[in-house]
Amino acid sequence: MFKTILLAYDGSDHAKRAAAVAKAEAQAHGARLLVVHAYEPVPDYLGEPFFEEALKRRLERAEKVRAEAMALTGVPREDALLLQGRPAEAILQAAIGEKADLIVMGTRGLGAVGSLFLGSQSQKVVAEAPCPVLLVR
């Protein structure tokens, strides 16, 4: 049924659980598993040398998150994408570009009441995705 499954991964506990689900779904369907980690762009107004330092730190963090996702899912580096941009937009663009049949991602609830609500990124992806979205908490 699914040929390409996209895992949106940010390193959170929800994302770690989503990684296990995405890996199992990919194995069950014989599908390609693609991992996407999006990181926010560094604001231009920081100026030099602050911009370069902030960008370096952001990229280092993104690489660590990607390495963690690769370790959890077993995907090769070429299937673990780092994308700069707002997370929901980057996930949606990757889903379109890679022709994903399913997006798997974590929700982000905080506390007893917060767990009833989706995070803003999850809401946007669910509302605009070109394919089904599986949310994991």
From Swiss-Prot:
Gene3D superfamilies: HUPs. Belongs to the universal stress protein A family. This is Universal stress protein in QAH/OAS sulfhydrylase 3'region. It comes from Thermus aquaticus. The lineage of its organism: Bacteria, Thermotogati, Deinococcota, Deinococci, Thermales.
